[in-house]
Amino acid sequence: MDPFPDLYATPGDSLDHFLEHSLQPQRDWKEEGQDAWERIERFFREQCFRDELLLDQEVRVIKVVKGGSSGKGTTLNHRSDQDMILFLSCFSSFEEQARNREVVISFIKKRLIHCSRSLAYNIIVLTHREGKRAPRSLTLKVQSRKTDDIIWMDILPAYDALGPISRDSKPAPAIYETLIRSKGYPGDFSPSFTELQRHFVKTRPVKLKNLLRLVKFWYLQCLRRKYGRGAVLPSKYALELLTIYAWEMGTESSDSFNLDEGFVAVMELLVNYRDICIYWTKYYNFQNEVVRNFLKKQLKGDRPIILDPADPTNNLGRRKGWEQVAAEAAFCLLQVCCTTVGPSERWNVQRARDVQVRVKQTGTVDWTLWTNPYSPIRKMKAEIRREKNFGGELRISFQEPGGERQLLSSRKTLADYGIFSKVNIQVLETFPPEILVFVKYPGGQSKPFTIDPDDTILDLKEKIEDAGGPCAEDQVLLLDDEELEDDESLKELEIKDCDTIILIRVID
């Protein structure tokens, strides 16, 4: 077999043949990888910690989980990456893992070197370090006994945060709340969620796994090989998640599609990486307050945003090197492996999922619509106008927890405001010369009101009372820390459109 088959010289309609004959792992390679795994796993379970004290205690291996491409079922022939996650009894929390992981890794390294002869493989032990941070894994370079190929294996000691878990289990929100409160480096505790990462990929159709293999091969042979092993590039896992997203959006999760169409869809996403904002709610969602606030903050960050479906702290888009990836993807789209896909055959893959918008208007039932976060807000306004038969000017606003109420501009998009998840908007209809003012209640929530500039502060207080607020005589309104008198008009006070007025309720 050609060790470096030429993807760019392979016509798109021949990619299935290319994958079957060049990328699918052969039986002997899979068997050797499994044998190496079993021997090293046995060493950790039976030898590594036996008759030794570590951190002044006897250490027990709670469970061993296979991650990486081998664990997910997306291995390439003669190119293996296996992640061995060791869940150890010496870690009882994320914080304890962070404190003691370097000591544990150093201990494991010494034991591996000392006992390597018993493993029947020639093994070189490397410490994997990211910048100045303490290492979180060991890398084993395992020499194949039958070929010149190398089996790469990462050993990652981890805290067993999930406990026993089945394929379809959803972790308790408290686990993610604890993860977020631990304030570790983003993604630092992802190994604790390897089982979820593996299930997320392993349960997918075979055809999708083949597309994942194709994208991974492109990453290794057309990208990583070009820039070198030491270059800082997005992880393979980031591209893996992008591929799954493209498939979900482009085929509605069908297991019947053409490989070249899927490959082109992924390359097009990579070219437009600056607009990517992707997340899933399979294992965590917006119901828990701590998790919700954290997720909304994550989704407001710099793009690309690709949140690990198993670990919300792990944004795979944060790494550098996307410019190089986009340039290579643009070049790839010009090669024969992609040019067989015509315009009508291309998948419709948005750079972010549609956002659920709940439309609120005083005195009416809430209404829900879905919109592309990159679509101009004027289009959403037009849809609201048709639904509600509005004749005046539409003023729509939103407020995030802990933030100020903001008016949404027709010329912008929800993405411009960092809105990529479910949002409530308040709709008001104004007629000249009315203006919009925001009234901030004692709890921090703001409400919009329309009012004529010639109206008085007392008129505004009565509007607040009519909307369910305190009685007008119990209200004190402030602007720039100065109390507003009842008989003064908004025009006299120079209150402008979209100004925020503070409401204080006076209790006798």
From Swiss-Prot:
Mg(2+) binds at residues 81, 83, 154. Its cofactor is Mg(2+). It is an enzyme of class 2 (transferase). InterPro entries: 2-5-oligoAdlate_synth_1_dom2/C, 2-5OAS_C_CS, 2-5OAS_N_CS, NT_2-5OAS_ClassI-CCAase, NT_sf, Ubiquitin-like_dom, Ubiquitin-like_domsf. One of its GO terms (biological process) is innate immune response. It holds the Pfam family OAS1_C. It comes from the Eukaryota. Keywords: Antiviral defense, ATP-binding, Immunity, Innate immunity, Magnesium, Metal-binding, Nucleotide-binding, Nucleotidyltransferase, RNA-binding, Transferase. The keyword RNA-binding applies. Its EC number is 2.7.7.84. One of its GO terms (molecular function) is ATP binding. It catalyses: 3 ATP = 5'-triphosphoadenylyl-(2'->5')-adenylyl-(2'->5')-adenosine + 2 diphosphate. ATP binds at residues 69, 213, 216. Gene3D superfamilies: 2'-5'-oligoadenylate synthetase 1, domain 2, Beta Polymerase, domain 2, Phosphatidylinositol 3-kinase Catalytic Subunit, Chain A, domain 1. Strongly expressed in spleen dendritic cells, whereas, in bone marrow-derived dendritic cells, the amount increases during the maturation process. Expressed in many organs, the highest levels being in thymus, lung, and bone marrow. Residues 435-473 form the Ubiquitin-like domain. Coiled coil: none annotated. Produced as a latent enzyme which is activated by dsRNA generated during the course of viral infection. The dsRNA activator must be at least 15 nucleotides long, and no modification of the 2'-hydroxyl group is tolerated. ssRNA or dsDNA do not act as activators. Interferon-induced, dsRNA-activated antiviral enzyme which plays a critical role in cellular innate antiviral response. Synthesizes oligomers of 2'-5'-oligoadenylates (2-5A) from ATP which then bind to the inactive monomeric form of ribonuclease L (RNase L) leading to its dimerization and subsequent activation. Activation of RNase L leads to degradation of cellular as well as viral RNA, resulting in the inhibition of protein synthesis, thus terminating viral replication. Belongs to the 2-5A synthase family. This is 2'-5'-oligoadenylate synthase-like protein 2. It comes from Mus musculus. The lineage of its organism: Eukaryota, Metazoa, Chordata, Craniata, Vertebrata.
